[in-house]
Amino acid sequence: MSRLKQPIFLKKIKKVINTIPRLEEQIFACRNKKRSDNPLLFIDRKDEERILMSLYFMENESSSPHSILCFIYWRYTKKIYRLSEDIVSDVANTYVDNIPAQILKELPSWSIYVSAENLHTILPTSYPIHGFFFYPFLNGGGGIIQLFIIDNLKQSQGTTGLKEKNIDVVGGIIGMEDSRGGLLGSRKMECIDNEVVVTVNEKLKDFRDREFNLLNAQISMVLYICSQINDIKEKNQFKRSEKHKKHVHTHHELPAHNIREWDVGIRMGQAIRQYRQQNPQDRATHRCKRPHIRRDTGIHTDRSKKPKLAHERKPRLIWLPPVPVNLEDVNKLPVVITPIDK
């Protein structure tokens, strides 16, 4: 974790927030201080509804209410998460679909910013980005109903600024395939000589495909951050009671003044890199077994010693053969599955 200079996009989001005067002061003034001084741990849903209604009555079409909420919550913590190149190369090309949205409640905060500078070395996109904001929107019952991603665009081909996109969550499931509806816009149906002919705009289709691949990579990176929450979550601050000399845990957290950057998956990336160096593989074949990394649980340790913390446990490289999922023919399932420790 290091102290960084204030990024350029801070000016962009400040301009967006200022579309409603004194909005940031109002939302934090309305929180329930009896439960927590940290609005990221508890904030009344009515505050969000009031923001949405305020924008609705103001007929402000230039700024999305969800973008404003995302920026307000992010400015409270000012954390940037960066994945190592090895992790990005493995995670970004993983196709995700039908993922339970419940896992997103493991996010370090309500709104996060993920640096994606290395994303384009392996995934050409329709527009280059520096990174992206991620904000899950909840309903009154606490269920996630939409995911909002705001890309921080690079200066390229006259395009710059912030671009918002969203994914609907239906029945608590993130359906990535459902978001590909825009691909239909690249197809045109015509009736020629009593026959239906389908023509495809290849340029538009290529744009839609690359846009979807970027979205898939971003969701994969966010899911990886959720899976590594034990490594990146900050410890709760505590104060010592003078009377009983015991630790009293609190959830109080003051707004961050400086940008803080978190390296996610650095140890995992080092383990993958070391494995690849020790096991050089031929790019034209698939003989080399792909490692699957799991952190040692620390269960089988000396009970007389204090258990190791998550960041103290060494990663274990284990190769697991691919397991088919949801096959109709059970006879096609592998007979023997044996993990091989490396």
UniProtKB/Swiss-Prot annotation:
CDD domains for the chain: AcrVA2-like (cd22987)
Gene name linked to the record: finQ
GO MF, one annotated term: DNA binding
Keywords: DNA-binding, Plasmid, Repressor, Transcription, Transcription regulation
Top-level lineage group: Bacteria
Keyword Repressor appears in the UniProt entry: yes
Protein task: Transcriptional inhibitor of the F plasmid transfer genes. FinQ may regulate a gene or genes encoded on the IncI plasmids, and coincidentally may inhibit F transfer when coresident.
DNA-binding residues: 208-227
Name this protein carries in UniProt: Protein FinQ
Organism: Escherichia coli
